[in-house]
Amino acid sequence: MPAIAEPYRIKMVEPITMTTREQREAAIRAAGYNTFLLRSDDVYIDLLTDSGTSAMSDRQWSAMMMGDEAYAGARSFDHLVESVRENYGFPLVCPTHQGRGAEHLISKILITPGQHVPGNMYFTTTRVHQELAGGTFHDVIIDEAHDPASRHPFKGNVDLDKFQALIDEVGADQIAYINVAVTVNMAGGQPVSMANIRAVREICDRYGIILWSDATRLAENAWFIQEREDGYAGRPVAEIVREMLSHFDGITMSGKKDCLVNIGGFLAMRDEAILTKARELVVVYEGMPTYGGLAGRDLDAMAVGLREALDDDYLTHRIGQVRYLGERLQAAGVPIVEPIGGHAVFIDAAAFLDHLSQDELPAQTLAAEIFLDSGVRSMERGIVSAGRDADGNNRYPKLELVRLTIPRRVYTNSHMDVVADSVIRVFQRRREIQGLTFVYESPTLRFFTSRFEPLAAEAALEEGRPEPALAGA
């Protein structure tokens, strides 16, 4: 992809400061080697997540000043509904404070205890909400998604044979719905093809199964369809999004990604009965159905942002920046998930630290080491994120990854160069790195709040020796 300048001018800046090695060592120890527990003031370049970390436009800020803060019936809600109808094609909208709130509502509405929920790879919070509602998640993604080196252009696709086999095994009436994520975060930001979405729709129609989507990164998915799928080259992303969403009964949306806001989410659907149930629940858990736990200004910012995220020039630059970082790492021999995804570069931590077993938490270890080297914050997406099963045993995912997640409209390629240089330095001394172990394990979504220590420190403590120096010190 040729070099592309940012398709915007920068009107406001926020200073960031590089820290010393000593400061970073103290910070990561205080955080229990968990990058989620680091203070933002201790972070130089923050690639923890793209959720709620985007820079908003002047038009979004302008819309915020016009927000209607009425407790009920605010016109800001009408603006959001109008934008969703125009750009996504769904007539019915129920706002929530963020995507997690929408996941909670739809799980309670659609799942009867004992039912099954197939999907194209798990996502952490989605699966927890499904399980809390009494459902059982089944991964029906294609096998290529579990291979970091596979170059399949649509690694997010549903394996139609796996989906059919589950229907045959449990019966269509025992499937609450199928949840298709676009793109698939845990697979490396991988897209789903339009042909695959249509094929899943045909199966759902045959058996009367609800087809839902986690559409959080729908604009990026549409851009990949434009780039890779026959018949879509040259078509505007906005048009592809409308076609893509026309196949779904409804969507769960975190506005903090492809709506370019710092907070907010919603459910969008066609079925009045689902909307009625959502409104009954939202007043219990979120707020009135016309604000869903959000200020009116946030609804207005989201209404504008979801339009802006469908701009072709913006998306070409956004995905191009992610590729710039990924290609720098590839050129240095750093193992990453291929093809490079839409919102992040995913380092294959199992291959990067191939001398560590999965029980030695290679992805958690690598995220801590990158921070120690440069102050760059990344995120573990491996055994720690996968958690434990109903019997209390560790889940062992096939992918053990570190996610370098690029916030939208925030950093330049100079920042990406700093990140790449840091990862490459760590890669060059990877044999010195020892794993981590839990010292506190949170019982739910453990990757957020668990704490760790180096295995070498644990061994030294058991033997009464001083704690060894950190790698690279």
From Swiss-Prot:
Cofactor (UniProt): pyridoxal 5'-phosphate
CDD domains: Tnase_like (cd00617)
Top-level division of the source organism's lineage: Bacteria
Annotated keywords: Lyase, Pyridoxal phosphate
One example of a Gene Ontology biological process annotation: tyrosine metabolic process
Pfam families listed in its UniProt record: Beta_elim_lyase (PF01212)
Lineage of the organism: Bacteria, Bacillati, Actinomycetota, Actinomycetes, Micrococcales
InterPro entries: ArAA_b-elim_lyase/Thr_aldolase, Beta-eliminating_lyase, PyrdxlP-dep_Trfase, PyrdxlP-dep_Trfase_major, PyrdxlP-dep_Trfase_small, Tyr_phenol_ly
Modified residues (N6-(pyridoxal phosphate)lysine): 257
GO function term, MF aspect, one: tyrosine phenol-lyase activity
HAMAP family: Tyr_phenol_lyase
Enzyme Commission code: 4.1.99.2
Quaternary structure (record): Homotetramer.
Protein name: Tyrosine phenol-lyase
Family statement drawn from the similarity comment of this UniProt entry: Belongs to the beta-eliminating lyase family.
Catalytic activity, reaction form: L-tyrosine + H2O = phenol + pyruvate + NH4(+)
